[in-house]
Amino acid sequence: MVTLDFSAMEAKWRDAWYEARINESEPEPGKKKFFMIFAYPGVTGYMHVGHMRGYSVTDAIVRYKMMTGHRVLFPVGTHATGNGAIGFARKVERGDPATIEQLKANGCTEETIRSLSDPMEVVKFFSQVYVNDYWKRFGFMSDWRRFTSTVNPDYSKFIEWQMRKLMSLGLLVQRPYFAPACVEHGPVAIDASETDISKGGGAEVLEYTL
């Protein structure tokens, strides 16, 4: 009976694809073009299988387009602005047991864990984890040279331009916005169950207008 080593097969062909650089895209006049991107993951910690399911769908589409004669551009990035990285850094800073244990279980040294009390270090650390430990391990056809993050200076300039453009067209309106928040963990909680994350949710909800 033949025994197949699927892990070895996976590594063999993944390495062959990247060595051949078939994932990299350059302009090619006259060839059909196709652009693909998935929603940047927030830099809030390690991913779960649900993330990879969605990303695998985009990769399947990209591969189909490549096989049907398209020049495909498939960049990736991380959503590092907002409260995600800040919230994670605060957990590390105050020594949240579950967060520290998760980092240790994933092989982080004490030095690395201490550094993750800085939100920018959280962004740098998990951006590398997402690319190297998840997306590349899955063999995605992303052009890794085109990785970006929403905290990169050039990306920030793009957002500034976008906001000014929308403002000039009268498409931005400032109004009161109501959202759940936690005075300990910071705004804005995704839903009421996250207003006391440290106790597993289900906290009492009090409404205020600030």
Per-range role (PLM):
Residues M1-L210:
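N-terminal, positively charged nucleic-acid-binding surface of large information/translation enzymes
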